[in-house]
Amino acid sequence: MSDAVQTGWQLSEQAPLRTLNTFHVEATARWLLNVQAPEALPQALAAPEIAGQPLLVLGSGSNVLLAGDPPGCVLCFDNRETSIIAHRADHAIVRAGAGVNWHALVLYALQQGLSGLENLALIPGTVGACPIQNIGAYGAQVGDFIHVVEAFDRHSQQFVRLDAADCAFGYRDSVFKQQPERYLIVAVEFNLPLLHELRLDYAGIREELASMGAELAGAADVAQAVINIRRRKLPDPDVLGNAGSFFKNPLLPSEQIAALQASFADMPVYPGEHAGQGKLSAAWLIEQCGWKGKREGDAGVSPDHALVLVNYGTATGAQLLDFARRIAESVRERYSVILEPEPRIIGAHW
């Protein structure tokens, strides 16, 4: 592997990616670009080895499945600065570089007396990746707290600032996911309140707080409750390869929901993102089809959470993808519901 080192960036050839994705599957980048100084990005992208080539941005690789070697160049941001850039009477603006660990940012905000992100504690990944998927958990979505996304626009070759409306946030969606080849996120600014109405009505948070003896809960207590729940339900990707929840919870029109409930009375249904729709539990659908805890070779579904696809050791990305496709097909056959993957599939089509 040859290396080219420049001010603020480094280019490596034939770089292994196993440690750069949380499924821990083997893949190789023809070129790997590490950027420490975002202002050097235009110069780095103009390097003759990678100019004009396809570009894949990897944070910690916690929301991708490498089903093959990515074409072109893999880009990793290594800017890890976090600071409060503005104080207001009831909130503050926190700026974090794309390379900052997401959970570290949540803890930083809590240490500064700021709330809003506590339900998103312990989600693997980096700050730069969080707007792409509009990460969410336990009743919260990061898009509700994003003030500005700073990005390099590959179309205009300019650095731009996109406010929350420009980002077009939706359920596990954003303009960055819709146009993956256009924007390279270099930093995110968050609008975080000093006092925030806590979200306690999701997935056993109240029960966990009670077991902690935290009847008068604050944001830090909620974060600890979420951490406890996640550690019990979700495998540590450092120990067992996974990307968290592999499938989105399906959003369906109310009429389709009613028809399903007429046939499957015990099917849980949750409020949708908009009027006239409901949300199904993908985990429930998968478990009902018999996949929870199932294993074939080193590809499997966690015995603790039916949404979590796991690599027990040497499964390839292609094997994991085939396993996931068969899960989705069995759900479609039984319930006429189409499951969509949360992670971005690289090197193959879903």
From Swiss-Prot:
Gene3D superfamilies per the UniProt record, alphabetical: 3.30.465.10, UDP-N-acetylenolpyruvoylglucosamine reductase, C-terminal domain, Uridine Diphospho-n-acetylenolpyruvylglucosamine Reductase, domain 2
Residues annotated as catalytic: 172, 245, 342
Enzyme class: oxidoreductase
Function: Cell wall formation.
Protein name as catalogued: UDP-N-acetylenolpyruvoylglucosamine reductase
Species assigned in the record: Xanthomonas axonopodis pv. citri (strain 306)
Gene Ontology molecular functions: FAD binding; UDP-N-acetylmuramate dehydrogenase activity
GO CC term, one of those recorded: cytosol
Entry's EC annotation: 1.3.1.98
Gene (UniProt): murB
FAD-binding PCMH-type domain residues: 24-195
